Amino acid sequence: MGRAEQKADVLVKDQSPGDVKNEVSSRPEDAHSFRLLSAEDKHGFMLLVLLYMLQGIPVGLAFGTMPFLLKSYVGYSQLGIFMLSTYPYSLKLLWSPIVDSLFVSAWRIPCTKLELSLGRRKSWIVPIQLIVGITFLVISYQIDALLENAETSIYLITLVFFGLIVLAATQDIAVDGWALTLLSEENVGFASTAQTIGINVGYFMSFTVFLALNSVEACNKYLRFRPQSTPILTFPAYLQLCAAA
């Protein structure tokens, strides 16, 4: 056996299983790609993106839009009171065991013979979306008055958005758990990608995009041929749009 062959044999023997695994996984044909997912996993991925996007809308409102709007009406101390409404999103670990353990397998629609199949995750997601939609619709008729009288209504505004963030955090727990079974085992890593895309799109839509469409100056400068005195999208109209979604 030549010296070169002996050296190659020693190198092969010195390789650890991890080295071999890394070498194999680095091959282009073994890399995971969205276009290589099965149709079922693609549908699951898109559903996760949609659910995370809906979750990102109230998060963007509470963390971005409302503080931006409130600073024109209240001082820093009252703005700090409102920011208490964002705390539940960081404390969702406290009630995540409840979300994982309590659920309804099926729900019979009153006055009908129809039965809605829910399960462990949809038992939380479906009611949460209904409550969030109704809340958006109700406050859309009062939000302008609440902002104009923010100094006296700051606690009510904080309470409303505290509830919305609790619901968003609870949905996050349910969707995270559902992602583990919605995608196949070898593609479950795409759940984090869906979460990143969905939440950021929802946050961006309810913060940056909304504020741009709500600004008369921005609308007249970038989006209109003729200046007008009203924005393209008012806050009540945006909340009603979110409620419909």
Where are these regions (language model features)?
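Symmetry-related core transmembrane helices of the 12-TM Major Facilitator Superfamily/SLC fold
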Residues: 126-135, 158, 231-245
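Cytosolic juxtamembrane N-terminal segment immediately preceding the first transmembrane helix
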Residues: 2-52, 116-119, 123, 148
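Glycine-rich segments within core transmembrane alpha-helices of 12-TM secondary carriers
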Residues: 85-93, 132, 189-218
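Transmembrane alpha-helix termini and helix-breaking/packing motifs in multi-pass membrane transporters
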Residues: 97-107, 114-115, 140-148, 203-232
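Intracellular juxtamembrane helix-capping segments at the cytosolic ends
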Residues: 66, 166-183
